[in-house]
Amino acid sequence: MPIPLAVDQLLSDKRLRKASRRRWREMKGRARLAEQRRVNKLRFGDYSRIVRMLADCCTADLKLPRTGAKVVVPPTFSIIDDPVTALQVILSFAKLARENRLRTVEIDHSRMQVCDLAANAVLDLVASELSTEARQRGSKIRFFGRYPIPTHLKRFVQCIGIVKQLSIAHEVPSPEEKNGVRVFDKRKRHYHDPVDPTQADFKSRVAVDFVDHINGCLNDHGRALTPAAVHKLCVYIGEILGNAEDHAGFEDWTIQGYLDNAVNTPMCEIAIFNFGASIAETLTGLPADSYTWRQISSYVLMHRGAKLFRAGWRERDLLTLIALQGNVSSKNRSEKDTRGQGTVDLIEFFQKVYEECAKDSGEAAKMAILSGSTHILFDGKYRLSGSPERGKVIAFNAENTLYKQPDSSYVKSLGTLKFPGTIISIRFPLSTTSTVALGVNRNEPNRD
């Protein structure tokens, strides 16, 4: 039976209205995207502020070779294992780019044998910023390079390294090559629009997604975060990212995670870094009568009075170390304030990871914090201890007191070398022989 003319016209009008509304939504979406790009372009400016920050920290005199810019990644490229060499490579690249109009850049990884996620992430970000800068000018930089020889490192460069960061389509690994690899990569760019205030803020959503990534890595090897540990990790990753926004004076941070299950001893790697003021610079800028400065000044005065400060142990190194202790934050105004626990909680998380890994792996878990020109290494030898009431302390000396100088093998001054911000780099091995959940032992009651 044919549809009556009136009904047919009604359905036709309804389809037209739906199509019209769809076109209107699409037009509004394109307009919003165009406006967002315009605003982001204005905020970014003509030159990358991050590349400028890094370039300003480089004291070496550099000349651009006639053959063009070339970055030679060293055999050990790691914030954990060799921060000096890693920083020199990164800062030199930034300065070369800032002082010259680069048309081609070669990044040679062929010598790289040992690396960590953090060093590569910062180097890749410089390349990414230069690529964005070139697009702003309507030009282009051609990037090319050489892969590392070890297969797992080539996979690393493809899955989370320069290939991914620059979206080099013809070098993207196949699904078979990516099988067994877990990647997490989020960045808050300083030139992007603020998120919709009606939605959960970006850093909170990133913290939740990151904890899901870590849990996935652990699940691959018969481990798991307990519900209590999931909650804790979300909270203090959120606080660490919050610190990056609140203290540095420049809202640009990155958090990455990587796991390659195809290697003999899979290593779970974490990199968190931000740009802006270092930890020591933030504390140095506090008023003398502020609560936090009164809280920490006794340590500074004691080291000054005992003439402990010297070339390898400076006031800024002490301030960086003090900031790792419980309840120390430039944002605290009284004893009732509880900011400053994020890094302490991260150290405790690392200690639990270290204990788990030490049971069944020949590889040791390690963590490093690099802020400004101070590098602090964690490998399980020195531990955070003390009561929640009096505050937890890790002083990196036998007495575990901040009134004495720390072990220079663990708390190092990098001299004139400086990173404009803070980097946290963590790596720990995973295996299938342990099923104890991280965070709360299965044989212990949940105290949360």
Describe the role of every protein-language-model region.
Residues 2-69, 283-448:
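Flexible, glycine-/charge-rich segments associated with ATP-binding catalytic modules
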Residues 71-166:
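Amphipathic alpha-helical interaction surfaces in cytosolic regulatory modules
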Residues 77-82, 110-118, 278-279, 329-332, ...:
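Short acidic, S/G/P-rich loop/turn micro-motifs used as interaction or catalytic elements
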Residues 114, 118, 215-238:
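Conserved short strand/loop->alpha-helix "switch" segment adjacent to the catalytic nucleotide/phosphoryl-transfer site
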Residues 126, 160, 227-263, 341-353:
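Conserved ATP-binding N-box helix of the HATPase_c
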Residues 159-206:
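Internal, well-ordered alpha/beta segment that forms a basic, Gly-enriched binding/recognition surface
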Residues 195-224:
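ATP-dependent phospho-/nucleotidyl transfer catalytic cores
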Residues 243-291, 360-363, 408-413:
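ATP-lid-like helix-loop hinge signature
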